[in-house]
Amino acid sequence: MDNVNKIYIDIDYDRLRKEMYDLNVDQFLIENEGQMSVQTIPGTPVDKQPLSGTLSLQVDWDSHDASDPNSKPKKRDVVLEEKDFTEVCDFLKGTYTEEVINMLTQEYKVVRGRYMMMNWKSCLTHHIDQTPRIHLPLVTNKDCFMIIDGKLVHLEQDITWLADTTLMHTALNSGRHLRFHIVFCLPPIEDGRTENQLEFDLE
């Protein structure tokens, strides 16, 4: 598997974008550190669902003092698992976005889906994920990139992408406008295969 590959699946990106704006998701992201869950753990109260799977599930970055070179974020008291975020959040019930989530769940068993916004002139930490990610770029610009295993890639808008984020990577928006993606995690492999041995409908 290359660092990024196209997934050929029929998604109406215009409808996804329209629903994002109609549901005021963009405003929620601006007010809540750029993330909003689209999948949650079954039984999560409705009012807790939108933030239930956001930010790091392992560490609390609020405990990190960036001015101290020896500071490290502490591990969360309760560490959640990506694979447990399987239920579509209530605010998306009956929407086209729910249809897309269900389609991706059927095809790829996706978990812990989130809307993710990147502010202009910003980037993420350099890190690795437990499993690859599926990206649905809703709004992007030519100055948005991922760097995966040292290679610079641009995820074009309105194309569904599989990114091998089990490699060291980051993402950056060096443009002048906000970037909006929907991002899904693939589930952990249970049969001994590595993530790179998965088969997809790729180019």
Task: Enumerate the language-model features and the residues they cover.
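Short beta-strand His + acidic residue motifs that chelate non-heme Fe in jelly-roll/DSBH
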Residues: L124-H126, C144-M146, A163-G175
